Amino acid sequence: MKLDVFAGQEKSELSMIEVARAILEERGRDNEMYFSDLVNEIQNYLGKSDAGIRHALPFFYTDLNTDGSFIPLGENKWGLRSWYAIDEIDEEIITLEEDEDGAQKRKKKRVNAFMDGDEDAIDYRDDDPEDEDFTEESAEVEYDEDDPDDEKSEVESYDSELNEIIPEDDFEEVDINEEDEEDEEDEEPVL
């Protein structure tokens, strides 16, 4: 196989993605290729060994998917995105979705042999209309300012967060004299 695009270039310097693009461009729009056929063409053109292709195959497949110039056409066929207008791609997707919607399976209705003619029997499969209206109310956390347990839990959580940042071993012990603080608050400023 000869690709005119790469005339004068060394095949060892070409990437598999460049060769794939050139092969698809040369074949034209109506000749999409299966992935395996595309890889075989690339291998033949580049002259790579089976082991070399096996090693490069995951990278090539990733490049093929992430490169914006290629498009998967289903059934592992690949083509160039430039072959298809954006509207045409959307139309293909829409027609596929319409085909899937038309073939919905009909659900079979089960019949309970024990409920024939008995109006008082309870059918536990029926949903209770009261259940449909039920919505679980979100429990709001209320803070009671007078409850010392709330303060303790807040202090404990704050301390645990501080311990994650700075271990307790690094703290210095400081004595706090509460009487001194109260005396300072009671004093009036001197003018």
UniProtKB/Swiss-Prot annotation:
Pfam families on file: HARE-HTH
Molecular functions (GO terms): DNA-directed RNA polymerase activity
Any one Gene Ontology cellular component term annotated for this protein: DNA-directed RNA polymerase complex
Entries under InterPro entries matching the protein: Asxl_HARE-HTH (IPR007759), RNAP_delta_N_dom_sf (IPR038087), RpoE (IPR029757)
Coiled coil spans: none
Disordered: region residues: 118-191
Record Gene3D superfamilies: RNA polymerase, subunit delta, N-terminal domain (1.10.10.1250)
Keyword Chloroplast attributed: no
Keyword Transcription: yes
Domain HTH HARE-type, residue spans: 14-83
Protein name stated in the entry: Probable DNA-directed RNA polymerase subunit delta
Species of origin: Streptococcus pyogenes serotype M18 (strain MGAS8232)
Gene: rpoE
